[in-house]
Amino acid sequence: MRLHEVSGATETVEAAPAKINLALHVTGQRADGYHLLETLVTFTAAGDMIRIRDAATDSFSISGPFGDLLSAGDSGDNLVTRARDILRDALASTGQPARPVDIHLEKNLPVASGIGGGSADAAATLRGLLRHWDAAIAPEKLKSLALKLGADVPMCLASRPLIARGIGEDIEALTDLPELSMVLANPLKAVSTPEIFRRLQNKVNPHLPTPSTIGWATTGWMDFLAQSRNDLQPPAQALLPEIGEITGLLSEEGATLVRMSGSGATCFGIFHSFDAAKNAETSLRKKRPGWYFHATRTI
């Protein structure tokens, strides 16, 4: 999957890959209330898309299967327009022009579903606008802007396998995570992230081990992942029992590892091949026609 491309002379296209928390350990809580996390993250070919064109004035529009769930009103509430504005202000402080743009979001991922949709869209907007405006910004400054938009935005800015610690600002790239075939599954019901954290009984849990990955094959990674967990899954499932139903369905289809991503409600099942994942997607769509299922690969 190519993260970005230029379509024609005036349109910049930037992919916003889905973020998958293969493991998520809650290891503490700061005095300001933010929870400390350690998470192993990868990204998939499935995702949203950002398209940018020059315009007389700024504008923003949304399409896609989940576009109706978001407002295109340019009020600053959407992370895409917030990313545009915060980047423009940062560039203005260094004397770099940032001309008006029309930004179009193709919303292919379920909204508020634990796979970083909004954060990925914001990160893609930052990447795309820097290319569209032919602008430059120091990496640490860009990371700081991303963190202001949300804890997941810095990792989505990278859009590559990584381990993130703290509230998401401490990122360690992973160079040898193999390609994984998986099915993403969501019952298309919302689950409250704040309520999940309120119901989390243990705020200090065992740390995520640092994988010693030199020479690991896919089986080594799967063994490692099997020993990890998502600490948010039990309270999320208590709030939304369909999460347990999803994981059961994925297991029945032959997934070798099943887990919830982020704070849910999206779950993933890893399969031994993409063909197996596609077959599982077809079967699951028949079993639960009103739910979201998508076979994809990691990038």
UniProtKB/Swiss-Prot annotation:
**EC number(s) per UniProt?**
2.7.1.148
Please indicate if the UniProt record lists Transferase as a keyword.
yes
Active site (record annotation): 19, 152
Q: What residues bind ATP, as annotated?
A: 110-120
Q: What does the UniProt record say this protein does?
A: Catalyzes the phosphorylation of the position 2 hydroxy group of 4-diphosphocytidyl-2C-methyl-D-erythritol.
- Family listed: Belongs to the GHMP kinase family. IspE subfamily.
Protein name as catalogued: 4-diphosphocytidyl-2-C-methyl-D-erythritol kinase
